[in-house]
């Protein structure tokens, strides 16, 4: 008799995705982050659901409802901090996952890669909407500053901003709609994630060498299920350590002050995971130019498959490209640091140089290094 997992219509899908899936035998721990992102999404949806049961999306009660969750709801404090720090863990896993894709040439699976970029944008939108909900100072002013960027769009800009606000400033209508967006987007992310996996399973996984591994595949279960469980345990350990010992490490103290439209915080800045893009935005003195650079800093990922000039897919055997890749990582860390600093000397010039280097590395230096490496192969 054939096993039920291979015949049942629903179990067959799960079986082909998680059990009998042929997987390259040599994929490293950098391939663990896909499953960790799935775990992040489940954690965020569950904790978010329980928070939504007690939260009120109204300007007069939003801040106190979060305080009520932390003080009066059974284990509300841990649910709230798991959700806040879970978002940080989500972005850590996300950036490592993208970095892995860049290093090993996984972007050559173009459909998977483009859905991934769409996922990144959706997750960023969700995180931004979520940051507004506690209605602290940074929530209010962050929402004001970021939504105001749309006013840089010629002709329709200011109308568009007022349409998103639902009035002439960030107010009750804005908070209510941001709560609605924040609630619905994770389910859209889940749907996109399924499409992402669907496209991935059309081609199979890439591997560190970048060479097709069709002749050397092993079943996903038990080899990679056990590996993913180890990754998941380490992830849970990190998240719980962060939540229980340093819950406010990655947050902004200003968000413990209730939103006040009459008092602007000294330094308006987004959460740490947006600081690199914020630094690029700030480094251009022109408003529209800054907004375009901000968009391009993320959307540049879409063009990476087109910028592939190397004859080798992976960077495993390409020392020049490796050097430039790690320079890019250092540059992104520099941008993240600058984004959290006040707009004054020397941070302005450092931010501008780091922003130029970011685009230069991706658009010019890395494709050029690949061409040089191709020439060296002939020696």
UniProtKB/Swiss-Prot annotation:
One of its GO terms (molecular function) is metal ion binding. Heme b b566 binds at residues 97, 196. A ubiquinone binds at residue 201. Binds 2 heme b groups non-covalently. GO terms for biological process: mitochondrial electron transport, ubiquinol to cytochrome c. Its cofactor is heme b. PROSITE patterns: CYTB_CTER (PS51003), CYTB_NTER (PS51002). Keywords: Electron transport, Heme, Iron, Membrane, Metal-binding, Mitochondrion, Mitochondrion inner membrane, Respiratory chain, Transmembrane, Transmembrane helix, Transport, Ubiquinone. Heme b b562 binds at residues 83, 182. Its main location: mitochondrion. The chain crosses the membrane at residues 33-53, 77-98, 113-133, 178-198, 226-246, 288-308, 320-340, 347-367. It is found in: Mitochondrion inner membrane. It is a multi-pass membrane protein. InterPro entries: Cyt_b/b6_C (IPR005798), Cyt_b/b6_C_sf (IPR036150), Cyt_b/b6_N (IPR005797), Cytb/b6-like_sf (IPR027387), Cytochrome_b (IPR030689), Cytochrome_b_C_euk/bac (IPR048260), Cytochrome_b_N_euk/bac (IPR048259), Di-haem_cyt_TM (IPR016174). GO terms for cellular component: mitochondrial inner membrane; respiratory chain complex III. Component of the ubiquinol-cytochrome c reductase complex (complex III or cytochrome b-c1 complex) that is part of the mitochondrial respiratory chain. The b-c1 complex mediates electron transfer from ubiquinol to cytochrome c. Contributes to the generation of a proton gradient across the mitochondrial membrane that is then used for ATP synthesis. Belongs to the cytochrome b family. The cytochrome bc1 complex contains 11 subunits: 3 respiratory subunits (MT-CYB, CYC1 and UQCRFS1), 2 core proteins (UQCRC1 and UQCRC2) and 6 low-molecular weight proteins (UQCRH/QCR6, UQCRB/QCR7, UQCRQ/QCR8, UQCR10/QCR9, UQCR11/QCR10 and a cleavage product of UQCRFS1). This cytochrome bc1 complex then forms a dimer. Heme 1 (or BL or b562) is low-potential and absorbs at about 562 nm, and heme 2 (or BH or b566) is high-potential and absorbs at about 566 nm. This is Cytochrome b.
């Amino acid at each position: 008799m054939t096993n039920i997992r291979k015949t049942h219509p629903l179990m067959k899908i799960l079986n082909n995705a998680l059990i009998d899936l042929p997987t390259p035998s040599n994929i490293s721990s950098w391939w663990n982050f896909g499953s960790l992102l799935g775990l992040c999404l489940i954690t965020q949806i569950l904790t978010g659901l329980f928070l939504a049961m007690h939260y009120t999306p109204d300007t007069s009660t939003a801040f106190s409802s979060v305080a009520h969750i932390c003080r009066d709801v059974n284990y509300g404090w841990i649910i709230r901090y798991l959700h806040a720090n879970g978002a940080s863990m989500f972005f850590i896993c996300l950036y490592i996952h993208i970095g892995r894709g860049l290093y090993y040439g996984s972007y050559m699976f173009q459909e998977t890669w483009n859905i991934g970029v769409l996922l990144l944008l959706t997750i960023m939108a969700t995180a931004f909407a979520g940051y507004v909900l506690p209605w602290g100072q940074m929530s209010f002013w962050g929402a004001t500053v970021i939504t105001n960027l749309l006013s840089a769009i010629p002709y329709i800009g200011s109308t568009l901003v007022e349409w998103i606000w639902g009035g002439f400033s960030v107010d009750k209508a804005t908070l209510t709609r941001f709560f609605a967006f924040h609630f619905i987007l994770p389910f859209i992310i889940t749907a996109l994630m399924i499409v992402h996996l669907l496209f991935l399973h059309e081609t199979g996984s890439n591997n560190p060498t970048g060479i097709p591994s069709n002749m050397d595949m092993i079943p996903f279960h038990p080899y990679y299920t056990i590996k993913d469980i180890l990754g998941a345990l380490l992830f849970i350990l990190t998240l719980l350590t962060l939540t229980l010992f340093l819950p406010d490490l990655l947050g902004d103290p200003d968000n413990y002050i209730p939103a006040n439209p009459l008092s602007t915080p000294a330094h308006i800045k987004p959460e740490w995971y947006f600081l690199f893009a914020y630094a690029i935005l700030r480094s251009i003195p022109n408003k529209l130019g800054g907004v375009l650079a901000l968009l391009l800093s993320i959307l540049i990922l879409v063009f990476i498959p087109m910028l592939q000039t190397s004859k080798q897919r992976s960077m495993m055997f390409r020392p020049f490209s490796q050097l430039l890749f790690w320079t890019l990582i250092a540059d992104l860390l520099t941008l993240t640091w600058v984004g959290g600093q006040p707009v004054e000397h020397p941070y302005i010039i450092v931010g501008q140089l780091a922003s130029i280097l970011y685009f230069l590395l991706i658009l010019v230096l890395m494709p050029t290094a690949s061409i040089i490496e191709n020439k060296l192969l002939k020696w």
